[in-house]
Regions:
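Conserved N-terminal phosphate-binding loop of PLP-dependent enzymes in the Aspartate aminotransferase
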Residues: 1-249
Length: 249
């Protein structure tokens, strides 16, 4: 059953619970099938935001790529694979068939000193500034890279990426599939840097592993941009989005 455009009590209850927990203005929710699919949705949403902004300016779209971190892991579907570490990850053999993204250095560790953070920020800035006209957004696993080696990284670097995303008009995506719901000691890992992403993806603990479900959250402002843009809605409709059994769990 396709639940796109329809609703039911279990889905409403699930998303209202998420809204009550979600940081800041993230009160628009798209239910997806899994963490990887949630990442796919977030990438498409970021691109549609840039399509809408470009259309509003009457320009030509160039912002189609995404900046990700070395050491990252975001899933096993095609778009998600494209933002995983291209060398040290498990997807190197598919590199000729996935979208080519931009990669920033792996951030220094959680307890890094100020000098290491500043060095990383300078290196990241150089890459972001070079590709500023090509980028739609930035995607990170906030504070902790999971499958990429359980690497806890500096909250100061995440705060810096939030600031640069604002300066460059980029969409900041937080992949909290593995870090959300208290797994890092705070409800969401972004809280360690005291930032709110433009888009947040959650999964895993959302259903406790009983059934597959994920969610993509954004603000009403961002959702409205997409609704006013070409297409008039988010161009994604998985068959099992809002599955009532998964939503009830």
């Amino acid at each position: 059953v396709m639940f796109g455009g329809l609703t039911h009590k279990a889905a409403v209850d699930a998303v209202m619970s998420l809204v009550r927990l979600a940081p800041g203005p993230l009160d628009r929710i798209f239910l997806a099938d899994s963490g990887s699919v949630g990442v796919e949705v977030s990438l498409k949403l970021a691109r549609q935001v840039q399509i809408a902004r470009t259309a509003a300016r009457g320009g030509t779209l160039t912002r189609t790529r995404v900046a990700a971190l070395r050491g990252a892991y975001h899933g096993d579907t095609l778009g998600a694979m494209s933002v995983c570490d291209p060398i040290g990850g498990m997807h190197a053999m598919f590199s000729d068939s996935i979208p080519q993204q931009i990669f920033l250095p792996r951030p220094p560790s959680f307890a890094a000193d100020e000098a290491d953070v500043e060095t990383w920020c300078s290196e990241a800035d150089e890459i972001l500034d070079t590709h500023r006209d090509d980028l739609a957004g930035i995607i990170v696993e906030p504070i902790l890279q999971g499958a990429g080696g359980m690497w806890p990284w500096s909250p100061s670097c995440l705060k810096h990426l939030r600031r640069r995303a604002d300066e460059l008009d980029l969409v900041l995506i937080a992949d909290e599939v593995a870090t959300g719901f208290g797994r890092t000691g705070k409800l969401f890992a972004c809280e360690w840097a005291d930032i709110v992403p433009d888009i947040m993806v959650v999964g895993k603990s959302m259903t406790g592993g009983y059934l597959t479900q994920s969610a993509v959250l954004c603000s009403d402002e961002l959702a409205s941009e997409v609704s006013r843009g070409p297409g008039g809605s988010l161009m994604h409709g998985p068959t099992f989005m809002g599955n009532p059994l998964a939503s009830a769990v």
